[in-house]
């Protein structure tokens, strides 16, 4: 990763960002030999991705108006085992994509504590390694998967209390609209195998909000939540999704969720040179359907149930601020938690983490 920032006078600055990743997979896949009669790893598989972005930030009207113009370039190159949907290995395939992106964001400060913003971007999401290579167990590779592209529009407003406030509060609400093509979707091939595919073109509209509040210097409370409605816009070229689903909500996607939590730090007169903190989080996910809502009776459908998860922990920062130790218990009440496709997550679990900061 590389970042470069150059200032052009008082009100303008240019930023350049580059992010490069490379992955290589070598070895022997004995399970693959049994399934496909050939070893998917007989030839090394590789994925190279690069993102390059250039941004121009400008300030006008005594710095009340900020505009950020951005240009982006996305590149991907993959060498992957070519396995058909009927699980026949056809050899090795090379794919590469080069796609542009661009956007503009504008923010206006109405008052020192209140601002409004809007932005548009045309962006690309390159497939990651699992979406291309699979996991070599239940998800097979897809050598023909394409990047997602989307037109995104966001509008919002933000309030942040003044620095002199005794009870700092920040509140933000945003609305968004997204039109996505070549949406990457995990499709089921049979009872034991799945593959990531470009199945859907969709539209998504939604709202998200967040509030952070500090009633005490040592206590911070936050609440956030989001609602989103993702609908099928048109069917894929392969005909894997029937046109009768156009306009229906895309299944297997959470559409309403929220989080809240707090963080409390023991006051300085209790702990002098070190720091002890306590934290608590609550996560809520509304129930959502595993299959298309227009098929059959809702009461007979597989549903990912509502989830209510409580977690808490304690952190200790040693004197010198370079060593921290934290302990956390997730899902304290041992509720049933699920991922997409009704895959159950771990129940109550405990974690201990030690972090050492090197350098100044």
Predicted regions and their residues:
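Membrane-embedded beta-barrel scaffold of Gram-negative outer-membrane proteins
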Residues: 116-121, 147-205, 214, 226
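Transmembrane beta-strands of outer-membrane beta-barrel pores
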Residues: 20-26, 58-62, 71-79, 120-126, ...
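Gram-negative outer-membrane beta-barrel transporters
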Residues: 65, 170-171, 176-179, 197-291
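Outer-membrane beta-barrel translocator domains and adjoining extracellular loop/strand segments
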Residues: 26-35, 79-87, 129-136, 183-192, ...
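Transmembrane beta-strands of outer-membrane beta-barrel proteins
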Residues: 12-18, 65-71, 116-118, 169-173, ...
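C-terminal beta-signal and adjacent terminal beta-strands/loops
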Residues: 124, 278, 283-297, 303-305, ...
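Extracellular loop and loop/strand-boundary signature of outer-membrane beta-barrel proteins
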Residues: 1-3, 33-44, 83-93, 137-145, ...
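Face-selective signature of the C-terminal outer-membrane beta-barrel domain
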Residues: 1-93, 97-112, 119-121, 163-177, ...
């Amino acid at each position: 990763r590389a970042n470069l920032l150059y200032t052009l006078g008082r009100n303008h600055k240019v930023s350049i960002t580059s992010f490069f990743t490379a992955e290589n997979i070598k070895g022997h896949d004995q399970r693959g030999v049994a399934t496909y009669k050939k070893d998917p790893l007989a030839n090394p598989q590789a994925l190279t991705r690069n993102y390059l972005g250039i941004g121009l930030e400008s300030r006008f009207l005594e710095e009340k108006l900020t505009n950020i113009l951005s240009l982006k370039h996305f590149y991907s190159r993959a060498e992957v085992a070519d396995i058909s949907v009927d699980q026949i290995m056809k050899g090795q395939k090379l794919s590469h994509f080069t796609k542009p992106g661009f956007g503009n964001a504008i923010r206006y400060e109405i008052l020192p504590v209140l601002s409004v913003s809007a932005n548009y971007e045309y962006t690309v999401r390159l497939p990651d390694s699992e979406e291309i290579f699979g996991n070599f167990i239940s998800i097979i590779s897809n050598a023909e998967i394409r990047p997602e592209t989307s037109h995104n529009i966001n509008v919002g407003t933000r309030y942040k209390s003044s620095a002199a406030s005794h009870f700092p509060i920040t509140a933000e609400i945003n609305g968004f609209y997204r039109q996505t093509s070549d949406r990457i979707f995990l499709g089921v091939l049979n009872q034991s195998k799945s593959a990531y595919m470009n199945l859907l073109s969709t539209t998504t509209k939604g709202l998200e909000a967040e509030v952070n509040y500090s009633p005490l210097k040592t206590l911070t409370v936050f609440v956030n939540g989001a609602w989103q409605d993702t609908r099928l816009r048109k069917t894929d070229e392969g005909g894997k999704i029937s046109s009768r689903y156009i306009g229906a909500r895309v299944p297997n996607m959470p559409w309403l969720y929220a989080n809240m939590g707090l963080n409390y730090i023991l006051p300085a007169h209790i702990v002098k040179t070190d720091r002890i903190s306590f934290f608590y989080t609550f996560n809520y996910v509304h129930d959502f359907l595993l299959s298309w809502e227009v098929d059959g009776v809702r009461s007979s459908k597989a549903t990912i149930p509502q989830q209510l998860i409580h977690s808490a922990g304690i952190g200790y920062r040693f004197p010198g601020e370079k060593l921290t130790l934290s302990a956390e218990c997730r899902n304290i009440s041992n509720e049933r938690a699920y991922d997409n496709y009704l895959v159950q997550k771990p129940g109550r679990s405990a974690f201990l983490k030690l972090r050492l900061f090197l350098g100044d």
